Amino acid sequence: MSDLPRTITASQNNASRLDTVTVEQLTGGERADAVTLPTGKRHPLPNAHFPRRPELLWAADEKYFPTNGHRRWKAGEILHAMHGWAVPFFKSRVLPGDFHPLIAYLFNEWKCNLECHYCWAYDNHVKGMTEEVARRSIDWLHSTTCRVLALMGGEVLLRPDFAHRIVDYATQKGFWVYLPTNGRLLRPDLIDRLADAGVATFNLAVDAWEEKPGLPKAMVPIRKNFEYLIRKQYKYGYTVFLNINICRNNLDDVRQLTELAHENGIATDYHICEEPMLSQASFRHAENNPVFIREEDHAAICELIDWLIARQNEGWHMVNSVERLAQMKSFIKHEIDHWNCRAGQNSLIIRVDGSLAPCFPTYSATYDWGTIENPKMDAKQLQEMKHSCEPNCFSTLNHILAFCYNDGRVIRWLAKQAMHGFQGIRGNME
């Protein structure tokens, strides 16, 4: 049996942002564990070979710096992105059925080395994923349409050798690998190993310039790691973006971090601070939280969002579309409607024990969506659940996926990229 929390009490249910029927459905069952291997048989990850690309490890960084500020992407890098995203997408449009994942979030850790006061997605009493579950997860995903693998936690680099082996194994099977981290453990030697293994993008999560109450993910403590990561991206062929959560107490920091990203030619991705969708037994900051947005903060947050929109209209690189940024102003006022979430259909999460769930907010749910090798995503159940949760959720990734499931949008967006030779991303999925 897994050591994940299995129950949520009635008093905890009262704190949920979902309706009572949905909460009871999500917390009243008992999910299955991943099927164990026969006694005596192990299925660990192979050791990661390093360096795989010694010519890059020893090459001068300056040789690969952009000419005239314009980064050039090689044909192999473009094809790798196509095989990761475009090919699975088109397969999902023509294959029968509803379950065709494009991206999977592999929770290799549920522990974290920091404590952000908005974050419920960790419990330092829960053991991380085993090598066997990691390998079986990747093998199973390879048998589906999925070719984008995102490590997830907690902090994914708590066991750096383990993370390196996951990345190496996944990239050798053709996955486009996405690695999010708070950057504290992302030291130069580890950057070299992960980059050599083939990480496609680093999502560097920072919410403040210097640490402040409730927001330890700051730039100052990781500045040297950040600069090394930026410098090495050109020769290894990965991208970097800053992932910033807009809270009530970091509005000036958001501007400063956005300017830093622009100065370094990288993109930014914004989230709006949300309270947990389902109450979490390990979450300790439900009351008197300095980061949660209050009604008196709305005007200042709307002003910040308008500033971000203006910067994007000037050509600053952002993952969020202008439309989605503008919707943040509606979301904080509880005015968001349904938006065709694709969780459980084209995205999913794999918990540390190998059990499945549609999305991050449902990590603690006890409803049985199956396990690796035996998924049980039910279209009717997902539709009923999303009727309650969609208006209460501001998932950036699933909203982008929702926009993709409009063929006209995709064709127009791909045509725009093709006109520029697929040299970087031009515009958002509008």
Which residues does each predicted region cover?
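Radical SAM enzyme [4Fe-4S]-AdoMet core and its adjacent flexible, acidic
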Residues: S2-D33, L37-E55, M129, W176, ...
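Conserved alpha-helical substructure of the radical SAM core
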Residues: S2-I8, N13-L18, G28, R42, ...
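Short loop/turn motifs at secondary-structure junctions and domain boundaries
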Residues: G97-D98, D337-R342, C393
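Short, intrinsically disordered, charge-biased short linear motifs at domain edges
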Residues: L102-F107, R324-S330, L348, G370-Q383
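Short cysteine clusters
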Residues: C112, C116-C119, C341, G354, ...
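Secreted/processed peptides and extracellular or luminal domains of membrane proteins
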Residues: Y118, Y122-H125, S347, A365, ...
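Short cysteine/histidine-rich metal-coordination sites, predominantly Zn2+-binding motifs
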Residues: T130-I138, N406-K416
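Membrane-interface junctions of multi-pass transporters
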Residues: P361-D407
